Every structure is written in C-alpha cells, then in structure tokens.
Amino acid sequence: MANTMNARPATRWYIAVFLAPAVFVYTMIMIVPLFGTLQMSFFKNGEGGLAFSGLDNFRTLFGDVRWSASFWNALANNCWFFVIHMLVQNPIGILLAALLSNPKLRLRNAYRTSIFLPTLLSFVIVGFIWKLILSPIWGVAPNLLDAIGLKSLFAPWLGKEAYALTTVALVSVWQFVGIPMMLIYAALLSIPDEVLEAAECDGITGVSQFWKIKLPLILPTIGIISILTFVGNFNAFDLVYTMQGALAGPNYATDILGTFLYRTFFGFQLQVGDPNMGSTIASVMFLIILTGVCVYLFFIQTRMRRYQF
C-alpha cells in the first residue's frame, strides 16, 4: 500500500511523440518563415548586397510620401472591407442560424448545406463567376434586373471607384457567410434544454427568447467569429486579386494590404519587386493582427466568460 501511495505517476512520453510531427511541420511552415520575414524587414539592398538598416524600411513606409500614401490607402480599404463583413456577414449568419435552429423548419438540412457550399469553392472560381455575372457586357446581372423591372439600378459596380470595394466585399460575404452560420448554429444547439424550458415557463418564447436568453449565451461564439473575421480580412488577397488584378483597380480603389504586399514583394509590370520593403509591410500586417487578437483575448473575452456555462 505504501509503495502504491509513493509511486510516481507514469511519464506520458507518448504525448510528445504524437505532438512532435505536428509541431515540427508547423514550425517549418509558419514560425521559421515568420521570423525570416521579420528579419528581412531590417535589411535593405545596397551596393555591396544586403546591409542591416534598422528601422529605415519602416521610416520609408510611414515617412516617404509615395509609400505612405499607398499604405494608408490600403489600410483604409482593408478596414472598410472588415467593417462590411462585421455589419453584413455576421448578422446574416446569426439570422440564418436562428432560423435553421427552429426544429419546425422543413428541409433545414438542405438549406444549411446550400448556404455553406460556397465556402468550399476556391477564390478563383468565386471571383471569375461573379466577375462574369457583374460584367456590363456579357454578364447576366443586367438581364436579371431587367426581368424584375430594376434594370435602372444596374451599374458597372466593379468599374466604379465608389462601389468596387464594397462589391468585392459583398462577394466575399456571399462566399463565407456559411462559416458564422454554422458556428452560431452549433452554439444554439449546445444551449441546455433546461434553460429554454425554464424560459418558456416564464412566458419567454419566440423572438423574445432569442434576444433575452439565446443571444447572451452565444456571445462568446460571436466574439470568436469576430476575431476570425478580423484575422481573415486583414490577410485577404485572393478574391481581390482574382476579380480586380494585382493593381486592385480601378485606380487602387480595391487595394488592400494583401495586394499592396504582393506588388511590393514580387513586383508587377514596370514595378520592380523589393522583398525587404515587402517584408516590412508583412511585418506591419502581423503587428496589426497581433494587436487585434490581443485586444480580444485580454479585454473582450474576459468580459464574456460570465455568459459561459
């Protein structure tokens, strides 16, 4: 008995064995390139090759008129891109999840699948399809609007500076609205039946039950969706590149940090690529995303814990 009491717990070495391959792959694919990018941002090409420049690249990005104008334009567009997703995609996702969680709704599995299906498509497919649909020359959008008597509302939205970015953002919303819908749907299903039954006993049903009972309980999930939206939007590149090209036309109206980084790092047309300045932009993007995630984790999430079971 004494030997059993004093026996040390067995070392779970197998945990390290199973984690090692995943940690190694993640380190090689994510961590090493990240530190390599941060390192490149402190160097610049000189006459004798690469030379340490300290924060000169960052001073150029924020201090040089040409660089700073492009950066702030891309950052402002990225913020608007994020705002549209927060104001359109996530509320629609919550609404769809609330409707699909109703057990009386027929064919809800078919609706859920059809809404989530665009998420599985590649950016290239989605971008080209919507570019063809919205084309004023051979697109079907003018004919569809004409069929319902709204042809006067049609405009070359992708060709106008005032509407291009919003149009691309709405296409992105159409593609990814299934993700917040599924997460909210799962959160709604995880609410204990006892809570809902108690609410019904108190006369709280229907829409009132959603606002007073369900919504506060799914706030942590909404917070996770918001931070995922933030990270995804500030890493966005593929859809804008597919629909508007590397120049993010018209007149850089759809230029976001991802396309600005691409042109700077790899070059485009007459612009020569500068990997060091591109790494500087990537480092700033990383700091922006890191700041947003830290604000959520240390300030917002801690206030939402009281809603969790």
Annotate each PLM feature.
Residues 1-5:
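Gram-positive cell-envelope targeting signals
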Residues 7-309:
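A structural signal for multi-pass alpha-helical bundles of membrane permease subunits
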